[in-house]
Every structure is written in structure tokens, then in C-alpha cells.
């Protein structure tokens, strides 16, 4: 195997770490581990061939970053950390402070733009749910952040005096018990945020242009049946974006 093009892409989110080994054409291996169990990654990564490059999108804080550095140290490969910027890989940021945008959101936007090349929403349903808008010319127009499914249900259970209710239920248009009321309210709130942003982006781009929506993150499958707009689920959107960024960096000659 030619290892000179091997990339280890790592998506270090608030709840879990996703990773994949890519050879420039396809994924050779991939996995997912909870942040609380991230030291188990040593077993997964020891079995891999040494990558030529490592690119990480980390939003889980300094301790997670330090642990990743220690886990990856045996390969003696320089670690690259994804950061948001004003312009990259065809996407232009309108964020008031581009560097302040979460690197996972930025990388996901790059992946979505390369997939669709059209106006779209990028919805990442995780610990928090982000709903970000891309214009038809690849401009990141802005986005919203709301609590994700688990955070929303837990907050209601903890603070609404419903301590004995399990965090479960089923969706009903008109719920007739407390468990279903909690669950259905969570679904309505999250899908409402997505569909409101969809309407705003459709208005911005012009009603004649179809806006696509990409759902990603651990809660994407939970929301998908309840979203009544054009959409698709992409499981590893951030990892895709890391591959695109790494490929673009490889095309730029090194300077001293």
C-alpha cells in the first residue's frame, strides 16, 4: 500500500469522535467512539498504517485536544487543526468574525458546497443543533444554534418538575400523555427551526430555486421523518469536508 497519500481525518465533537482513514480516493477504515471513552481509540488506531497527514476538527475543548495529541503522538505526524476562515475551498463566510465560527460548522459547509454547488441548508443535529445557510454562490449567510434533542429533553425533565418521566415517547400531532408531549414538543421545536430557516433561505434565493437540505449528526435520523422539505442525510459530512480541505492544501506548493 502506498501510504504517502493517507489522511487520518478526525471529527472531535461534543459527544463523540468520528474518524476515517482516506487514501485520496476512498475510505479505507472508519470508526466512532464516545468522548468519554476516547482513550479506547488507541486500540483502533494501532491497527492502522501510519498516515502521511492528520487533520482534526475539534470542538470538544482543550482536554480533548490534548488527549488526541497524546494518542496520535506515536505516529510522529504533524497534526493539522481545522479552523474557520473568511474564504476556503469555494465557500465565503459572512460571519462578523469568521474565525469565531465553530470549525465543525465551517468544515460541514465546505463539504455541503462541494456536494451540491447550490443554495442549501446544513443541519447538524448533535448536542446542539446548528442550521446554517449557504447561498447559490457559496456564501455562508449565517445560521442558528439551538439545543439538540437530548439536551432539550433533559432540560425539560430536569427543570420543568417532570423528574419521574423517562426521556422517551413517540410523536403525536396532539399528544395525550406527558411522555409523548415532551417528545413531540422537542420534534416540533427542532423541525420548526429547520423549516423556518428553509423558508428564509428560499425567500432570499427566490422562490423559483429549489433549496436542498443536508442533515447530519447523531440526531439526523430522528428528525428526518418529520421534516417536510427536500432533504438528505449525510452521516459523515465533517469527515468529507476534512478530506476536501486536505486535498486543497496538498495542491498548494509548500513555501518557506
Curated annotation (Swiss-Prot):
Family, per entry: Belongs to the type III pantothenate kinase family.
A GO molecular-function annotation: ATP binding
PANTHER family: TYPE III PANTOTHENATE KINASE
Keywords assigned: ATP-binding, Coenzyme A biosynthesis, Cytoplasm, Kinase, Metal-binding, Nucleotide-binding, Potassium, Transferase
Enzyme Commission code(s) on record: 2.7.1.33
Binding site for substrate: 95, 102-105, 178
Task of the protein: Catalyzes the phosphorylation of pantothenate (Pan), the first step in CoA biosynthesis.
Protein name as catalogued: Type III pantothenate kinase
Cofactor(s) required for function per UniProt: NH4(+); K(+)
KW Transport (keyword) present: no
Gene Ontology cellular-component terms listed: cytoplasm
Organism, scientific name: Nitrosomonas europaea (strain ATCC 19718 / CIP 103999 / KCTC 2705 / NBRC 14298)
GO-annotated biological processes: coenzyme A biosynthetic process
Amino acid at each position: 500500500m502506498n501510504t504517502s497519500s493517507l489522511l487520518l481525518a478526525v471529527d472531535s465533537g461534543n459527544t463523540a469522535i468520528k474518524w476515517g482513514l482516506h487514501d485520496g480516493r476512498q475510505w479505507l477504515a472508519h470508526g466512532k467512539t464516545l468522548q468519554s471513552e476516547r482513550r479506547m481509540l488507541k486500540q483502533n488506531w494501532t491497527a492502522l498504517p501510519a498516515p502521511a497527514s492528520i487533520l482534526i476538527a475539534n470542538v470538544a475543548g482543550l482536554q480533548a485536544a490534548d488527549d488526541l495529541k497524546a494518542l496520535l503522538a506515536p505516529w510522529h505526524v504533524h497534526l493539522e487543526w481545522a479552523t474557520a476562515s473568511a474564504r476556503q475551498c469555494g465557500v465565503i463566510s459572512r460571519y462578523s468574525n469568521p474565525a469565531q465560527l465553530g470549525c465543525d460548522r465551517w468544515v460541514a459547509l465546505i463539504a455541503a458546497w462541494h456536494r451540491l454547488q447550490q443554495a442549501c441548508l446544513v443541519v447538524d443535529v448533535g448536542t446542539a443543533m446548528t442550521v446554517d445557510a449557504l447561498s447559490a454562490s457559496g456564501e455562508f449567510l449565517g445560521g442558528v444554534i439551538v439545543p439538540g434533542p437530548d439536551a432539550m429533553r433533559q432540560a425539560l425533565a430536569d427543570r420543568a418538575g417532570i423528574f419521574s418521566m423517562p426521556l422517551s415517547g413517540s410523536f403525536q400531532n396532539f399528544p395525550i400523555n406527558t411522555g409523548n408531549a415532551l417528545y413531540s414538543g422537542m420534534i416540533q421545536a427542532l423541525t420548526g427551526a429547520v423549516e423556518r430557516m428553509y423558508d428564509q433561505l428560499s425567500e432570499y434565493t427566490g422562490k423559483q430555486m429549489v433549496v436542498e437540505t443536508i442533515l447530519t449528526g447523531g440526531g439526523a435520523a430522528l428528525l428526518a421523518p418529520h421534516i417536510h422539505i427536500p432533504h438528505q442525510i449525510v452521516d459523515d459530512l465533517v469527515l468529507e469536508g476534512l478530506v476536501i480541505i486536505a486535498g486543497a492544501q496538498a495542491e498548494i506548493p509548500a513555501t518557506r
